[in-house]
Amino acid sequence: GNVDYICGGGNMVFDDCTLELYGYSDKGNAGYITAAQSTKYLFRNCTITGNDNGNSTQATAYYGRPWTSGADVKFINTQTNGRVVAKGWADWSNGTTAEDATGFGEYCNLNSDGTEFKSSITSKQLTATQYNSIVATVESDYLGNWTPAHYVSTMAVNNSGSIGADAINNVKINSGNDLL
């Protein structure tokens, strides 16, 4: 995607997904991955890649920008591969700043060389305790009374700070927008 390619309302969990940025032909900046309203987006065990669209500058993006101050977006255990800009989170043109979005957070994200990527907005860095709280409430906060067939709720941080769980595979969307 280019700009806000995951946006709007609805609570969503993206697990073990590839997010591919597409740069513009005249510049490398791909924009923003998310623009959440007052809803929750959780990205865990994902990989951010890019198609530079023939541009010599690598396509990069922000994790997201807050459509409202109630935006809640978490990137956890995500391979950023140098595609996320150093600030990590952007402001919205309506005056809502990334700092206003108290639900923005990141935890254990890595660069392609295996070093940890932390955005320059330090208030968005989650602790292991905060991460474990998110994991404990995925079903109630994100999924409500719906449980996907391949969902695995056991994903705690071990003492070394590593995260582990089985991937959710083979999830398909039918024409009625129901996940199968």
Describe each PLM feature range.
Residues 1-166:
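Sequence-level preference for short, compositionally simple segments enriched
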Residues 159-180:
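Pro/Thr/Ser/Gly-rich low-complexity, intrinsically disordered linker/stalk tracts
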